[in-house]
Amino acid sequence: MPPQLQNGLNLSAKVVQGSLDSLPQAVREFLENNAELCQPDHIHICDGSEEENGRLLGQMEEEGILRRLKKYDNCWLALTDPRDVARIESKTVIVTQEQRDTVPIPKTGLSQLGRWMSEEDFEKAFNARFPGCMKGRTMYVIPFSMGPLGSPLSKIGIELTDSPYVVASMRIMTRMGTPVLEAVGDGEFVKCLHSVGCPLPLQKPLVNNWPCNPELTLIAHLPDRREIISFGSGYGGNSLLGKKCFALRMASRLAKEEGWLAEHMLILGITNPEGEKKYLAAAFPSACGKTNLAMMNPSLPGWKVECVGDDIAWMKFDAQGHLRAINPENGFFGVAPGTSVKTNPNAIKTIQKNTIFTNVAETSDGGVYWEGIDEPLASGVTITSWKNKEWSSEDGEPCAHPNSRFCTPASQCPIIDAAWESPEGVPIEGIIFGGRRPAGVPLVYEALSWQHGVFVGAAMRSEATAAAEHKGKIIMHDPFAMRPFFGYNFGKYLAHWLSMAQHPAAKLPKIFHVNWFRKDKEGKFLWPGFGENSRVLEWMFNRIDGKASTKLTPIGYIPKEDALNLKGLGHINMMELFSISKEFWEKEVEDIEKYLEDQVNADLPCEIEREILALKQRISQM
């Protein structure tokens, strides 16, 4: 465990910005203990100012970590070591005394719902990595708020890091700087420690001037101590500790203790032509279009969608029983490939300035490029790939890494919701689950009850490309789109969701499931998607008001034949889009039951077992 050292240390590190005396006592102790351990040359207490940000960006440009993209205003490109490009589930752990606090004990094999590490193993791993790991580098102290500063739903963290890329990215993704330090006072904060794991002088040359230590990468969460400790990776999901580490893994555990929800969900506001507005939250696995839905331009005349957040929602019932949600983030950390003027015009407008791109391709005129950008190149313009080599479409490999990213301020989104920073949050009236299902699952259905809706979330599955190319596409279980992000035992998480129905005066949101990705026999999508998805949101909007007509099926309520507004669309095969096959659903419920019984085992709530049985029975009577 991180050592609890005595106060008043004789730090050899020189404080180059800020003053230790100005820090709250607990923050100062956290900093001094870890500075003594990691031995940086300098300490820089971040103030979050424009001036500081400009200096750090300039310094990274000089060191070759960032390149300036001259086509845009204050936009930058980082190319990472090719071994450090994504979250690494196998090296992401939660440390608790008891394994069962972190994951249910599966019937056989390993848990797919998280990775547990014992306290003893973590202590060994920590002591093998952190002593002296920041030698020759600067330790940056990043005070940050998840959620609007001062909101009752917000939480504060302090991240210590030796990566200026992390500082610049955290300034976009969180509210960061002096105002946060002033707000901490004697209050609680989550302690975040990050190192790229490359003390100076270097033992090996860097690739792309990108410091990382892939052999020793470890991302650990210590929920009982409110600590997140990350070593060896500079990539966003592993190093921007406010993101998945805090906002989902740590926060879901805090939420369980404090009676709220921390979820992998977008939040959007939708307004009908009469000016009535509702807020919806939606959970989809990666690459199923969360950001596209959150920033949609509706094709339906008179309808308007506005974005509160594209990735994470913190939700809590207020005294009146409304489920209130905030977006704890301050920016978007979006997947670049596939983003275009056609698929997401609002994202394209958002990223024209003040944006850090990572592992996308660069054009010779100082622009960015990726697969699916759908923009013609000016004549004579060449492309340099994310591997820093000249690239042409004949190369047989992508110019941008499939997980390449843009990190951009949410405030720049042209359709950001007026209430996106509202301290009390926005009232959620509908929750949407969804996945990429080429067969069997209809475009939309509504859960029969809160309990049934929780089961629908637990049963979420989505098509993923297997790592081994020859395996083709497989359908993966991804309950609540949270499978890589649960901060505690998934069985207890389900019980926590079910308990929301007991909340006094709770106005429970309706729960829906969508599938934009169903295909016909020729492998063509049956539904056009993107802006046309507003037609499905319209039906949900009217369902929440008790207006739209439905048909009861074994899996839930679907729209009656004429209930979806298809005006202006070409031919849509509604029969195929909404068909529910007995054979398919018998197999589906069997797979779901096996997964939940194997993986959640003794911790599966009896309400979920009852929902499985009831669904089986309804299907058998088809």
From Swiss-Prot:
Principal localization?
cytoplasm
Cofactor(s) needed, names only, are: Mn(2+)
Phosphoserine: residues carrying this PTM: S19, S90, S118, S286
The UniProt record lists the EC number as 4.1.1.32, 2.7.11.-
Could you tell me what the cofactor note in this record states? Binds 1 Mn(2+) ion per subunit.
Q: Does the keyword Transferase apply?
A: yes
> How is it modified post-translationally?
Acetylated. Lysine acetylation by p300/EP300 is increased on high glucose conditions. Lysine acetylation promotes ubiquitination by UBR5. Acetylation is enhanced in the presence of BAG6. Deacetylated by SIRT2. Deacetylation of Lys-91 is carried out by SIRT1 and depends on PCK1 phosphorylation levels.
Q: Which GO terms describe its cellular component?
A: cytoplasm; cytosol; endoplasmic reticulum; extracellular exosome; mitochondrion
- Give the binding site residues for GTP: A287, C288, G289, K290, T291, N292, R405, R436, F530, G531, E532, N533
Task: Give a single Pfam family match.
Answer: PEPCK_N
Resulting phenotype, G309R: In PCKDC; uncertain significance; decreased phosphoenolpyruvate carboxykinase activity
* Renumbered residue ranges of the record's region Omega-loop: 457-487
Catalytic residues, chain numbering: C288
Residues holding substrate: R87, Y235, G236, G237, S286, N403, S404, R405
What GO biological process terms are annotated to this protein in UniProt? cellular response to dexamethasone stimulus; cellular response to glucose stimulus; cellular response to insulin stimulus; cellular response to potassium ion starvation; gluconeogenesis; glucose homeostasis; glucose metabolic process; glyceraldehyde-3-phosphate biosynthetic process
Q: What is the effect of changing S90E?
A: Phosphomimetic mutant, promotes the serine protein kinase activity by reducing the binding affinity to oxaloacetate
**Which keywords are on file for this protein?**
Acetylation, Cytoplasm, Decarboxylase, Endoplasmic reticulum, Gluconeogenesis, GTP-binding, Kinase, Lyase, Manganese, Metal-binding, Nucleotide-binding, Phosphoprotein, Transferase, Ubl conjugation
Quote the record's binding site residues for Mn(2+).
K244, H264, D311
Q: How is its activity regulated?
A: Phosphoenolpyruvate carboxykinase activity is regulated by acetylation and glucose levels. The anaplerotic conversion of phosphoenolpyruvate to oxaloacetate is improved by PCK1 acetylation on Lys-91 (K91ac), Lys-473 (K473ac) and Lys-521 (K521ac). High glucose concentrations favor PCK1 anaplerotic activity by triggering acetylation on Lys-91 (K91ac). At low glucose levels, SIRT1-mediated deacetylation of Lys-91 promotes the cataplerotic conversion of oxaloacetate to phosphoenolpyruvate.
Residues where Phosphothreonine is found: T178
Q: In which tissues is it expressed?
A: Major sites of expression are liver, kidney and adipocytes.
Q: What induces it?
A: Regulated by cAMP and insulin.
What is its quaternary makeup? Monomer.
Q: What does the protein in this record do?
A: Cytosolic phosphoenolpyruvate carboxykinase that catalyzes the reversible decarboxylation and phosphorylation of oxaloacetate (OAA) and acts as the rate-limiting enzyme in gluconeogenesis. Regulates cataplerosis and anaplerosis, the processes that control the levels of metabolic intermediates in the citric acid cycle. At low glucose levels, it catalyzes the cataplerotic conversion of oxaloacetate to phosphoenolpyruvate (PEP), the rate-limiting step in the metabolic pathway that produces glucose from lactate and other precursors derived from the citric acid cycle.
Q: What other remark does the UniProt record contain for this protein?
A: In eukaryotes there are two isozymes: a cytoplasmic one and a mitochondrial one.
This one is known as Phosphoenolpyruvate carboxykinase, cytosolic [GTP]
Q: Which organism is it from?
A: Homo sapiens (Human)
